[in-house]
Design a protein with these regions (language model features):
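Conserved, well-structured core segments
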Residues: 48, 95, 150
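Short amphipathic alpha-helical segments embedded in low-complexity Lys/Glu-rich regions
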Residues: 45, 125-126, 170
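Non-catalytic DNA-recognition/assembly elements of restriction-modification systems
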Residues: 12-35, 40-49
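A short beta-sheet element
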Residues: 51-110, 119-123, 127-131
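Amphipathic alpha-helical coiled-coil/heptad-repeat segments
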Residues: 1-27, 137-182
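Non-catalytic beta-sheet/beta-sandwich ligand-binding modules that flank or precede catalytic cores
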Residues: 20, 24-25, 37, 49-52, ...
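A short secondary-structure junction motif
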Residues: 4, 112-116
Length: 182
């Protein structure tokens, strides 16, 4: 349920008024698992090898194809999320999720903070089996899911765009400082 104990979010798009439904994450996905790819890093490999936080290299073969939500399974990055689409290999220290609701679930899980699931004092660990049992609230209508996902993706794109501008301005400032204060 939401913070106010109802099935209704505090902020909605117009025309949507039905309560959201609660499901286990496993019921909203086609696959939640740990990567099992064996790989050989290739200098000219065609397919990305996805590690716990990003692409770690390339191989000439792939084991998985589709849209994925990924998180580190073990270590300091356990619970950090990223998305990837395409044909890939996925390492064994990475948990992946495939769903027709990938974008929505990506944003929902960011709010959830998967780091709360990690356990262990030395090396935090997030298990696929724990993810499967997460309770997720989702709109009943796919159109509402699509609109929420589209809005949040637009905000992410704006953030990325402005971050590039900030990075370029920092480079410009550094160059100006070097030239002005020789």
């Amino acid at each position: 349920m939401f913070a106010d104990e109802t099935g209704y979010p505090a902020l909605r798009f117009k025309r949507f008024s039905t309560a959201w439904e609660q499901h286990k994450l496993s019921k909203l996905t086609t696959k939640i698992g740990t990567g099992k790819s064996k790989y050989k890093l290739q200098d000219n490999g065609r397919y990305p090898i996805l590690g716990s936080t990003s692409v770690i290299g390339y191989d000439n073969n792939f084991d998985y194809t589709g849209d994925f939500i990924l998180t580190a399974r073990v270590g300091a990055n356990a619970g950090n999320l990223y998305r990837f689409s395409g044909s890939v290999k996925i390492t064994d220290n990475t948990v992946f999720i495939k769903s027709k609701y990938n974008k929505f679930l990506y944003y929902y899980l960011q709010k959830y903070d998967l780091k709360k699931l990690s356990f262990g004092t030395g090396q935090p660990l997030v298990k696929a089996s724990d993810l499967k049992n997460l309770k997720i609230l989702k709109p009943r209508l796919d159109e509402e899911i699509y609109r929420i996902s589209k809005l949040l993706l637009s905000v992410d794109n704006l953030i990325t765009h402005h971050q590039h501008k900030i990075d370029n301005l920092k480079l410009l400032k550094r160059a100006l400082l070097q030239k002005m204060f020789v």
